[in-house]
Amino acid sequence: QERYGFKYLCADERNELAKVGADFIQSYQSKVPFLLVLSFINPHDICFVMPSKTRPPFEKAYKREPEIKMAVDSLSRIADSMPVGFFETDASAPLPKNLQPTVNNIYDNGRLISDKTDSEWRRYIWMYHRMVEIVDAQIGKVLDALDKSPLKDNTIVIMTSDHGEMRGSHQMIGKNIQYEEAQRVPLIFAGRGIKKGMDDKSVICNVWDLLPTMCEMASIANVPNYEGISLYGLVTEGKPLLKRDYIYLESLQSYQIIKQGRYKYTVREASGLPCMFTDLKVDSLETMNLIEKPQYQDVITELKVILDEELEHRQIVLDENGWRNSKGRVK
């Protein structure tokens, strides 16, 4: 608690965490409001399922966290026990419609996994679905505890994630990739005061917005000069967000993105092409790079200006070593 400023309840993100969270809720007697954060690791273990020529061996990760190997091996044994031919059809796990790489792609850079068969991809996706089921059950244990608790009517639950999973789209897996599969995450609010039945996939927001939203929900001051905006009015009354018409994104893989409605403009430091442009209304699966299409040049110019302004604001420049700011290489 002295190190972090809060009490650290559990180091086991796979098995014990759900019980610890449920026990905390069931035993909580104080009148003081609380913030309970349960960071379930899965389905992140899927990152250690599919070896490839383009991916480093998993031995270091296994040595660092033996629990990873135990979890992966357990599911692998179940996958191996399935009937012969089980992964030969989409009945086991449908392949993504955009399994093939993007035409005129700027993001190969060793990330494509082109040495796998359709059956191997289905096995991978099937295991991913099982990991989602596992964490779904764990979250369910916590929600069941809350449902039986006096805290139920005075608690707000937020479910989200720090990144998505490519899951075979564009022959890629993992995160740190500019595609929608890796960028989009669930953001679910439930509980006291939350507007019921609302499902809005068009909202331009990200995890920056969690802090100001929770601060407003708790009637406490937000951090000064913080970039995020509160979603409180949206999730409680359905009020539209008026302060943002685009979002800026960056990644470990050194790309910079401006996403504005249906359009996405991406720049990467190390590629054969300078940038990528996608019209998500026309090509929701991002199968084509439209950067050279004449009909989009005005939009591309506008997004480039916005990106340049963002980079200037953040003091980020591109030199021979990649994207850098005043603190060094952008990560």
Regions found by a protein language model. Give the residues of each.
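Active-site-proximal alpha/beta segments of enzymes that process anionic O-linked groups
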Residues: 1-32, 44
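Short glycine-enriched, charge-decorated loop/helix-capping segments at active-site entrances
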Residues: 7-8, 173-175, 292-295
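C-terminal cap/loop subdomain of S1 sulfatases and analogous C-terminal strand-loop tails that border
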Residues: 17-21, 163-169, 195-196, 208-280, ...
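Non-transmembrane alpha-helical segments in soluble domains
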Residues: 22-26, 129-132, 136-143, 147, ...
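Active-site-proximal cap/lid insertion segments
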Residues: 27-32, 40-154, 158-204, 217-220, ...
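Structural motif
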Residues: 33-35, 182, 262, 275
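Hydrophobic/aromatic beta-strand patches that form the interior of the parallel beta-sheet core
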Residues: 36, 156-158, 266, 278
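Long, internal low-complexity/basic segments
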Residues: 51, 98-123, 131, 135, ...
